[in-house]
A protein has these predicted regions:
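Residue-level recognition of alpha-helical structural elements
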Residues: 26, 30, 58-62, 86-94
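Amphipathic alpha-helical packing segments from all-alpha helical-bundle domains
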Residues: 3-16, 28-53, 64-71
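C-terminal peripheral helix-coil segments that are non-catalytic and often amphipathic
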Residues: 13, 43-50, 66-112
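Short, hydrophobic secondary-structure boundary micro-motifs
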Residues: 19-21
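Well-ordered, non-membrane alpha-helical segments in soluble/globular domains
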Residues: 2, 38, 95-99
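Residue-identity detector for glycine
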Residues: 27, 35, 57, 104-107
Length: 112
């Protein structure tokens, strides 16, 4: 949960830069920055899922699902940031959103 709060704090501490990246970067070298964050997240999730598979013997979570879960995670933070103008409001909601994401991951990794 603390990592999610830190992400929100950093986004709001650099609000103008994040707004430019998220809403005005088309045509610049930064226009695919969200896809790059998703790719990094997807690689991390792939490693995590493979570790769970190796440790438990459960079936491997497929790449399609890993990709979508990475997208959902990134999109959650972007949506919260773009729709809440005040950091305190975003911080009020980020824990519940993070727990929702974590529980979804746990469900996928334990039911695959």
């Amino acid at each position: 949960l603390e990592t999610s709060r830190q992400i929100i704090r950093q986004m709001y501490a650099n609000r103008e830069a994040f707004l430019l990246l998220l809403t005005k970067s088309q045509g610049s070298r930064f226009e695919n920055c969200l896809d790059e964050v998703v790719d990094i997240s997807e690689q991390q999730y792939r490693r995590l899922c493979d570790m769970v598979t190796n440790a438990t013997g459960r079936p491997r979570v497929d790449d399609y699902m890993t990709h979508w879960m990475a997208h959902i995670m990134v999109d959650t933070f972007v949506h919260l940031f773009l729709h809440e103008t005040e950091e305190r409001v975003a911080l009020k909601h980020v824990d519940a959103l993070t727990m929702y994401l974590v529980r979804g991951w746990m469900g996928i990794m334990t039911e695959s």
